[in-house]
Amino acid sequence: YLDLPSVFDMPKEAAEFAYKCSGKLWIEAFQVGYFEEAHDYDLVSSFPSIARNLIDIRQLEWIQSSKYQSNAVYGYCKCDVTIYDFVMVHPILTRDEQGNLIAPVGTFTEFLTKGELDFIDKWKIGEYKILEGWWGIAK
């Protein structure tokens, strides 16, 4: 059998936060002009390709903290997020009242990964306050 990590290898609350950070897949296609040939890449195969390089969560110590943990491998946080008004396009997604995924400017509360927080900081597109967070830190 395969000895793979599962959701049961992390604290239940951390797994719940991770779940709330998921389900925001952003896929778009644009065409300007005419193309004789177009390609549709196999996204289904891309997920296992990425998953094979993920860190085994059984090798992490999980801590709960509202302070950003720069040394964490994974982080899942509930945040108050502000995306600045001048930002035209960004990947920080939330759902509107009808359940549609949107990438708004302004302030909203959302569950974000450490990677999303790092993106906000790197590109200076906004700011955030971590209300609650779960962090996986290498042992």
Language model segments and positions:
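Conserved acidic
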Residues: 1-139
